[in-house]
From Swiss-Prot:
Post-translational modification: Methylated by PrmC. Methylation increases the termination efficiency of RF2.
GO molecular function, one term: translation release factor activity, codon specific
Gene3D superfamilies per record: 3.30.160.20, 3.30.70.1660, Release factor (1.20.58.410)
The protein's role, per its UniProt record: Peptide chain release factor 2 directs the termination of translation in response to the peptide chain termination codons UGA and UAA.
Record's subcellular location: Cytoplasm
Family affiliation: Belongs to the prokaryotic/mitochondrial release factor family.
GO CC term (a single one): cytoplasm
Superkingdom of the organism of origin: Bacteria
Key words, A-Z: Cytoplasm, Methylation, Protein biosynthesis
Modified residues (N5-methylglutamine): 254
Protein name, as recorded: Peptide chain release factor 2
Cross-referenced PROSITE patterns: RF_PROK_I
Amino acid sequence: MEVKSAKELKRVSKELQENFLNRWKLLNLEQDKDRLKALNEKSEDPDLWNNPEEARIVSQKKNELEKKLTPWFTIQQDILDFPDLVELTLDEKGENGIGELSMEYNRLQEKFEELELLGALKNSEDLKPAFLNIHPGAGGTESQDWAEMLLRMYIRYFEKKGYQYSLIDIQAGDGAGIKNVTLHVVGDFAFGFLKGENGIHRLVRISPFDANKRRHTSFVSVHVSPEIDDEIDIKIEEKDIRVDVYRSSGAGGQHVNTTDSAVRITHLPSGIVVACQNERSQIKNRDTAFKMLKARLYEMEQEKAKEELEKKSGEKKDIAWGSQIRSYVFHPYNLVKDHRTDHETGNVAAVMDGDIEPFILAYLKTL
C-alpha cells in the first residue's frame, strides 16, 4: 500500500497502533509477559535444580512462552512509537519524508499481519513438535506413489521452513511408493502450522503406471498430531494395548536394523496403530511409539470435546474430520486448490517442491 499524503500517514499509523494494542489485549499477552517474568525468576533460583523434573517443566514452559512472545516483543516498540515518528519526520522533512514513512508503514503492517496469524495459534499444542503420518487410500501402486510424492513435498517444506524432521516409521510400497510413513517434526509452531494438513489429499493425473495413459484419481490421508508433554496425563491401560516387535522394513542400506527392534503398538479400544523403527534400541522405539499413541489419544479426546461443544451450541462443522481438503490436478489442467479456503494456484510444480506456505497461511486466517 502506497501512502501518498501526510494526513493519511497520520491516520494509518494510529490505526496500526490501535490494532496492535487491541490484539495484545485480546490474546492476553500482558498476562503471558507476567508469567514469563515469574518463570525467569524461578529458573534463576539455585534450589530449583535440586528437583530435575520441576526444573525441566519450568524450562519447557519458559521456552514455550519465549517462542510465543518474542515475535511480539521484536516489533512492539516500533509500532507503538510509529505515530510519533510520523509527526517528527513530517515536521522535519515535510512531504519529502512521506516516501520513507510509507515504506516503514508497509514493513510494520506486514509484520503485524504475520503476528495476527501467529495469534491464531493460541493453544499450547500449537507450539509443540508434531507427528505427521501419510497413508495411501485404496488404489495400490497409484495411491502409494502419490503418498511418496506428498512425503517429498512435506520434506521440501520442512527444509524451506527450517524445521528438523526424522522418519519414525516407513513401509515401502509394492513396486513403487510407500504404504505408510510417520515423521517427527520439530520447529517453532510446528503443530500449529501443520495441523491444517489433516485430511484427504486428492490427486488427478495421467497415470505413469497405466500403459493406456488413462486419467486416474488417487487419495492419501494425512494425519498430524502434537507431541504431548509428560505433565499431560493420558492413561493407557496395559490390557488395552498389543505390542508387536518386528524387523525394520526401511528402504535399505547400512542403517536398517538386523534385529527385531521395531515396535508396533495397537490401541485396542480405539483401533489406533502406531509404529517406530528409526532407533537402534527396541526400548527407544517403544518409548517413541508410546509418545505417538499418547498424542493420538489426546487429539481424539480434544476432537470429542470440540464436537460436544459444537453440538451444544448448535454449530455444525463445515469440514468433517478426515474429509477431502485439497485437490492436486495435473491433467487436463494444472491446479492445486484448497476446498476449505478456496486458495489455489496453477503452479503445481512449485507446490510439489514444498511451496505450501500460502495454503497453510490461508487456512490459519480462517481460525
